[in-house]
Structures are given as structure tokens and as C-alpha cells.
């Protein structure tokens, strides 16, 4: 993974603190951890469309009130948007059907309580930053930037009634002696590509100094780390989506969370060559 190229692809005006994205049919679907909109950006036309995920949606919500949408994943024709679970306000899951344009919203609190109870994760440690949904399994990427550093992958069969959750811990590489922790992930064939950032904080609520980001790979079958490389010393990359793939290289689109109220987002392209 040492051969990579990171470039600024474009800037989107109207989105701040981008926290996740999905590329589909020449469009980017983005979420912001300050907002209750889903943003649809057409790459060919450079047009931005805002989709309200809740009533009275807002672009910039106060930190104590925000639903903290940190994870977005594609499941069939649905985009699944998930709050981090790090406070009582952050337990919402929203599904957006890209065909019918219908929105379904529900409270995810019971599911998060089940995760905390089964896996002995305290309320101030839970911090879901990434999501992968397959036909059989749902994977949550727990960012272990709390006091106990519980960083890892939570997974279970995608059966809401009978879920038994498993936890696989991951000790990821450090940047300036601070561990990197998960910020997003995407599945490509049988390989999980993930982003992780180092932030000088022991709080799932308060932001700290950003020390950089890495990209890495995990074998889906063995759940073992297979590689990683630091891609930035300054950016906190929080969104990762597959863009293009060929025999010798793979391209991703990334977004970063600047932890500011400025309504503009830099979008990056990351190329990894064999």
C-alpha cells in the first residue's frame, strides 16, 4: 500500500463537517455530523441537492443537540445513515430509498443498548463512525478514542430480533505516539478498506488536535489487519467510498471533517497502486 497518490478533487460549497459519503451512479451522497440533511452532489453537473432526513432539517446544529450522523452505507437501493450513539441525541437511524425518494426514520437506542450490554462498552465509550451492510451481516466501526480506547469492529447477523454481537479489537498504528482509531470503512470484494485518524483527545464528545490519518486493509474472512499507510499528517479523513477499480489500482473518494461551522467541504481522490 506504499504507492498512493492523494489529490484534491474538488470543493463543494454548502456542506460543512462532512463525515461520510457514498459514490453511486455518478453522484456523491454525503452526510455531515453537524447537519440533518443528506446531500446529493452530481459530479458531471456540479449541482448540489439537499434532502431533509428529519422535519425542520438544519445545516448547522449546536454540538449538544446534533444527531451526529457519522456513518452512511449502501444496502440495495437504500442509503442507511446512522448516528454515532455517543450521546442520547445520537441514536437515530434513517433510510433513504434512492428510487422512491422515501425516508424511514427510527430510534436506534435499543440496538445501541444491546451492543453496550453484550460487549461491555460503557455509554461514554460508544462511538460508531463507520458502517458496512452485506446481505447477511452488519458491521459497525467503533472509534476507540475514549478513555479506555475500545477500538474495533462490532458485527452481527443482520437480524434485528435475534442479534448477538461480536467485537474484534484492533490496535492500529500510532501517529506521534497517539493511536489511530476508525473513522470509516468500505467493503471491496473480501477486503475491508478503512480510514483511521489520530486525534489528541480521550473523549468521544470533545475534539482534539488532529495528527493525521491512515488507510488500511482488513481481511473480511479472518478479521486480521493486512496493511496500512499514513496518507496525511494534517487531515482528519472521515468518509471513504469506492470510485474506480482496475487490475493494478484502486481509487477512492474521501471527505474530511474540519470540525468547523464553515459550509464548504474539500473532496479528495486517493489512488492506491499495486
Regions found by a protein language model. Give the residues of each.
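Sequence/structural signature of beta-propeller domains
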Residues: 1-274
Amino acid at each position: 500500500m506504499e504507492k498512493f497518490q492523494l489529490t484534491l478533487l474538488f470543493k463543494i460549497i454548502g456542506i460543512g463537517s462532512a463525515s461520510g459519503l457514498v459514490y453511486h451512479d455518478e453522484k456523491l451522497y454525503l452526510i455531515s455530523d453537524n447537519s440533518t440533511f443528506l446531500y446529493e452532489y452530481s459530479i458531471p453537473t456540479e449541482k448540489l441537492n439537499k434532502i431533509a432526513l428529519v422535519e425542520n432539517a438544519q445545516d448547522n446544529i449546536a454540538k449538544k443537540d446534533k444527531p451526529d450522523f457519522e456513518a452512511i452505507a449502501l444496502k440495495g437501493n437504500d442509503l442507511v445513515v446512522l448516528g454515532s450513539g455517543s450521546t442520547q441525541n445520537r441514536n437515530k437511524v434513517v433510510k433513504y430509498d434512492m428510487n422512491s425518494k422515501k425516508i424511514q426514520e427510527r430510534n436506534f437506542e435499543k440496538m445501541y443498548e444491546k451492543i453496550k450490554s453484550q460487549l461491555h462498552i460503557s455509554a461514554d465509550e460508544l462511538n460508531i463512525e463507520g458502517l458496512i451492510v452485506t446481505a447477511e451481516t452488519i458491521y459497525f466501526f467503533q472509534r476507540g478514542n475514549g478513555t479506555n480506547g475500545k477500538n474495533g469492529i462490532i458485527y452481527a447477523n443482520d437480524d434485528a430480533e435475534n442479534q448477538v454481537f461480536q467485537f474484534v479489537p484492533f490496535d492500529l498504528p500510532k501517529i506521534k505516539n497517539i493511536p489511530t482509531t476508525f473513522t470509516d470503512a468500505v467493503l471491496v470484494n473480501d477486503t475491508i478498506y478503512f480510514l483511521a485518524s489520530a486525534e489528541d483527545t480521550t473523549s468521544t464528545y470533545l475534539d482534539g488536535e488532529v495528527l493525521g490519518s491512515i488507510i488500511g486493509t482488513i481481511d473480511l474472512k479472518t478479521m486480521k489487519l493486512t496493511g496500512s499507510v499514513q496518507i496525511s499528517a494534517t487531515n482528519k479523513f472521515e468518509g471513504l467510498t469506492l470510485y474506480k477499480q482496475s487490475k493494478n489500482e484502486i481509487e477512492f473518494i474521501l471527505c474530511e471533517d474540519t470540525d468547523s461551522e464553515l459550509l464548504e467541504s474539500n473532496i479528495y481522490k486517493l489512488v492506491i497502486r499495486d
